[in-house]
């Protein structure tokens, strides 16, 4: 049987250095990171500097006969757009890369437009992280809907992870109704 293998969910980063829900996330050594109050093995220990680079990932993809990978993002990785723009330009046939905006505060529409102009073919929203203690960022807010319409007009995919349960389902129903041609991939 002849088929192509695609890794549908992978992450790349140069360094983890962020704060999520009040917890720091930092690259340590030997592939470990301080992660939400615990030390976790984020990459194999031979990746001593904690860098999860495209080159190491490609080496593993080649070994496993994986043709291409979808590179997603999450706030826990830190926003990696600068590095991932380089990955897009260096390996356009191996990686389908999602850009990510700072959705936890206003102004992300301009960020999304810039990412799309830089060649990102998808925008990732880790929507489960938008249930903030200071108030929810609604998926059907005016700025979100403007962004979704902009993406739909340019055939840019939405990659989104939703909160557990049905909390954000009515908002997504509205997005789908308003933007029926918007391609949407819902992750875990």
Model region roles, listed by residue range:
Residues 9, 61, 84, 115, ...:
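Conserved, mostly hydrophobic/aromatic
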Residues 6-10, 69-72, 95-99, 121-125, ...:
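Hydrophobic faces of well-ordered beta-strands that scaffold small-molecule active sites
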């Amino acid at each position: 049987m002849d088929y192509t293998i695609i890794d549908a969910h992978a992450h790349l980063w140069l360094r983890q250095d962020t704060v999520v829900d009040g917890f720091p996330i930092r690259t340590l050594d030997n592939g470990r990171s301080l992660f939400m109050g615990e030390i976790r093995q984020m990459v194999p220990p031979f990746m001593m500097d904690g860098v999860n680079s495209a080159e190491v990932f490609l080496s593993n993809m080649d070994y496993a006969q994986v043709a291409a990978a979808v590179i997603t993002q999450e706030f826990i990785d830190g926003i990696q757009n600068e590095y991932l723009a380089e990955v897009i330009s260096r390996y356009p046939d191996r990686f389908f890369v999602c850009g990510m905006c700072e959705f936890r505060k206003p102004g992300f529409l301009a960020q999304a437009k810039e990412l799309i102009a830089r060649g990102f073919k998808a925008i990732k929203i880790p929507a489960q992280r938008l249930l903030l203690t200071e108030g929810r960022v609604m998926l059907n807010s005016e700025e979100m809907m403007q962004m979704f319409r902009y993406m739909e007009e340019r055939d840019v995919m939405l990659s989104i992870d939703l909160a557990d349960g049905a909390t954000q389902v009515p908002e997504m129903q509205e997005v789908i109704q308003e933007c029926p041609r918007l391609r949407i991939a819902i992750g875990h």
